[in-house]
Swiss-Prot record:
Active site, renumbered: D118
Disulfide bond sites: none
GO cellular component: tRNA methyltransferase complex
InterPro entries: SAM-dependent_MTases_sf, tRNA_(Gua-N-7)_MeTrfase_Trmb, tRNA_methyltr_TrmB_bact
Similarity annotation: Belongs to the class I-like SAM-binding methyltransferase superfamily. TrmB family.
Protein name: tRNA (guanine-N(7)-)-methyltransferase
Domain of life: Bacteria
Pathway: tRNA modification; N(7)-methylguanine-tRNA biosynthesis
A GO MF label: tRNA (guanine(46)-N7)-methyltransferase activity
Binding residue positions for substrate: K122, D154, T191, E192, Y193, E194
Originating species: Streptococcus agalactiae serotype V (strain ATCC BAA-611 / 2603 V/R)
EC number from the UniProt entry: 2.1.1.33
Amino acid sequence: MRVRKRKGAEEHLENNPHYVISNPEEAKGRWHEIFGNNNPIHIEVGSGKGAFITGMAEQNPDINYIGIDIQLSVLSYALDKVLDSGAKNIKLLLVDGSSLSNYFDTGEVDLMYLNFSDPWPKKKHEKRRLTYKTFLDTYKDILPEQGEIHFKTDNRGLFEYSLASFSQYGMTLKQVWLDLHASDYQQNIMTEYERKFSNKGQVIYRVEARF
């Protein structure tokens, strides 16, 4: 979903280089150096306005988080949340999720999150879905052996498609939630969309898949 253009968004990002990495190609292979530690690195592709990535960073200070989004205005709102939180273990990237191997070395990312990705419901747009096989090729490259993807959505069609895509790729479905909020899963951090959809009574689906 597109967000209305935010005045001053570009300047906002430029004025916060500690959090927003302006030349991510130069960071490839150097992420631990950039964070200043050897803690695990988790990324969220399509981080939206930052509720999830910020909440995770606050909950897990010994993990480094990178929020990735292609929309300038959206990322500027995520930066607001990061600044408000004061978390030191977050970086933000304004890049396309299809080109992750340009920014991360092989095995450099320990775990990745896909939350409420665009379902692209039309068959002709299948290749744009973030769980399509060519995206999985990229994810596998930047994750370690047996690296994991944690995926959440409210869209049943996309969820079923993604389960099939993961399985056909040879991935292991570690755990599947058909109604996350009705489960006893305690570690959930909600995204903005998740809270909105949940308040409307929509079921939230989740899966942890391992290469």
